[in-house]
Swiss-Prot record:
The gene is glmS. This is Glutamine--fructose-6-phosphate aminotransferase [isomerizing]. Catalyzes the first step in hexosamine metabolism, converting fructose-6P into glucosamine-6P using glutamine as a nitrogen source. One of its GO terms (cellular component) is cytosol. The keyword Repeat applies.
Length: 612
């Protein structure tokens, strides 16, 4: 949520970078944007509610230019969606600040600063930061780095901050605690951003800041950096693997459409570690073998779509590896009394690796005595891998659409690989079993491509869904989490109310909702629960409900009045949930198209949830 950019450029106008960078961060979610630039010794600011383009147009009209500046896309947390609440915030014409995160003690800090004579023009917690730094700056004789050092000592909460001063045209100071922030190095120019997508068009050399870091930047790089203990530190500069092409639409109309169709390649790339090297613990880290041999159970913590991936993994972990597994929503886990088990593996799942609730849940688990942790995420050098003892990166590539697609299916691949690896370590996988699992994984991208070929039929269904106000999704066993994911996708981007239930729970309440106006989507592959699912479908049909069935070629379903059937490719084995994810993604996408909603930037939602 929110996006930060900033730059010091020795030979170029920063406005070009600031506006381009903010546009590349639009996918994170926002409601307003702004930039502040030091122009001839004065800080000039432009802010607008709405799209970044509106703000950029205003900046061009005002002729703003300069060699140092900061920018921000805001997602409202404190105060409404208004221009005065948009960032950057300026204190006394001297200090300009952009901020991602939440300052939990901002009310007491605001009262303190008001007592010192500072006037507030907004309802935000960020203005507290600007005035606090300005106060310290005045007290210490104009040393910006030290002013930020002193000010952040007073803040409780999570933040990523970038600061410029009117009389320091060659200094940009940044600080990080709990929210992502990176420094990128070019030729006589230095950039900062919330994620690498904002800078990749300008440089690929990136250093990721860690919690507690404060850095002083100039056009020729990092001049000073201290860690959480206030000690001098260095951060390794790496070359980003992200390609600029992955951030462009190409021939597609929307990023979600592009990312749905990229899944065969993303799945193949993620599976490669298991197909080339086998299901070995070393795929997860050098200490994984001893950890996997010692654990007695698994706890998975995640939010949103990643939580549904975790629910799917529970079936694999218990059926393949025979290891007791528990799944919890991270935002619930971190606030309850937990019975800790030092021999339990804590797994966290996050596309960004920066989801705040998941990060804090992991820290909580470790504080209780959990010794072993594994993160599965899509972003190199993000917070969760750094906090975890083991890690496996998915290879989904950049995911721009707010509604997750390829990140979800690659998480499933990684979790399946984990289940087989644990089973192998525990002596539960024969050579024949491993060969079978390997072949299932090898064939998966092809099966997913066959499912994508069903798009015209699914698009036709979407025309009917577009007229509805509610929908019900049903699944059984390992396909129940896919029903949950389908309902989430539909509500996220079409704004149609959708719920998902285990099909066996119909008679315990949801059946009361069924009538001729309620479409009921059923995930119905040919597995051991198929007859049970058919019985549940009869219950829906008897109440006049209209059934939309995603079956497979062996399910023996026929379309009749009130029953629509699309047959996905039959994928024998444990990975059927991955294949059946594709149709529910396409259904949501084409229904959103038919309803005319903003597919890639649905209302009220953000891609990276870095606040509570």
């Amino acid at each position: 949520m929110c996006g930060i950019v900033g730059a010091i450029r020795a030979h170029h106008n920063v406005v070009d970078f600031l506006t381009d960078g903010l546009k590349r961060l639009e996918y994170r979610g926002y409601d307003s944007s702004g930039i502040a630039v030091n122009t001839d010794g004065k800080i000039k600011r432009v802010r607008r509610v709405g799209r970044v383009q509106l703000m950029e147009d205003a900046a061009r009209e005002k002729g703003i230019s300069g060699g140092i500046g900061i920018g921000h896309t805001r997602w409202a947390t404190h105060g409404g969606v208004t221009e005065p609440n948009a960032h950057p915030h300026i204190s006394g014409g001297m200090i300009a600040v952009v901020h991602n995160g939440i300052i939990e003690n901002f009310e007491s800090e605001r009262k303190r600063l008001e007592g010192l004579g500072y006037r507030f023009e907004s309802q935000t917690d960020t203005e507290v930061i600007a005035h606090s730094i300005n106060h310290e700056y005045a007290q210490n004789g104009g040393r910006l780095f030290e002013a930020v050092q002193e000010a952040v000592k007073r803040f409780h909460g999570a933040y990523a901050i970038a600061v410029i001063a009117q009389d320091k045209p060659d200094e940009l100071v940044v600080a990080r605690m709990g929210c992502p922030l990176l420094v990128a190095l070019g030729d006589d120019e230095t950039f900062i951003a919330s994620d690498v997508s904002a800078v990749i068009a300008f440089t690929r050399r990136v250093a990721y800041l860690e919690d507690g870091d404060i850095a002083l930047l100039a056009s020729d790089g990092i001049k000073r950096l201290t860690d959480k203990n206030g000690l001098p530190a260095e951060r390794k500069v790496k070359v980003s693997e992200l390609s600029l092409a992955s951030l462009e639409l190409g021939l597609y109309s929307h990023f979600m459409q592009k990312e749905i169709h990229e899944q065969p390649r993303a799945i193949a790339d993620t599976a490669e570690v298991f197909l080339d090297g086998g299901f070995i613990p070393e795929n997860f880290g050098k200490d994984a073998k001893s950890v996997f041999e010692s654990i007695r159970s698994v706890k998975i913590l995640a939010c949103g779509t990643s939580y549904y991936a975790a629910l799917t993994a529970k079936y694999w972990l218990e059926s393949i590896a025979k290891i007791p597994s528990d799944v919890e929503i991270a935002s619930e886990y971190r606030y309850r009394s937990v019975i800790a088990d030092s021999d339990q593996l804590v797994i966290t799942i996050s596309q960004s690796g920066e989801t705040l609730d998941t990060m804090e849940a992991l820290k909580y688990a470790k504080s209780l005595g959990h010794r072993h942790s594994l993160s599965i995420c899509n972003v190199m050098e993000s917070a969760l891998p750094r906090e975890s003892s083991l890690v496996l990166y998915t290879r989904a590539g950049a995911e721009i659409g707010v509604a997750s697609t390829k990140a979800f299916t690659t998480q499933l691949v990684a979790l399946f690989g984990l289940a087989v690896t644990l089973a192998k370590v525990r002596g539960l996988v024969s050579e024949e079993d491993e060969a079978r699992y390997t072949e299932e994984l090898r064939q998966l991208p092809g099966s997913v491509q066959h499912a994508l070929n069903l798009e015209p039929q699914i698009a036709a269904w979407a025309q009917q869904f577009a007229k509805k106000t509610s929908a019900l999704f049903l699944g059984r066993g390992i396909h129940y989490p896919i029903a949950l994911e389908g309902a989430l996708k539909l509500k996220e981007i079409t704004y149609i109310h959708a719920e998902a239930y285990p099909a066996g729970e119909l008679k315990h309440g949801p059946l009361a909702l069924v009538d001729e106006n309620m479409p009921v989507v059923v995930i119905a592959p040919n597995d051991s629960l198929l007859d049970k699912v058919k019985a549940n479908m009869q219950e829906v049909g008897a109440r006049g409900g209209e059934l939309f069935v995603f079956a497979d070629l062996d399910s023996n379903f026929n379309a009749t009045e009130g029953v629509h059937v699309i047959r996905a490719p039959r994928h024998v084995g444990k990975l059927s949930p991955v294949v059946h994810t594709i149709p529910v993604q396409l259904l949501a996408y084409h229904t959103a198209l038919a309803r005319g909603t903003d597919v890639d930037k649905p209302r009220n939602l953000a891609k990276s949830v870095t606040v509570e």
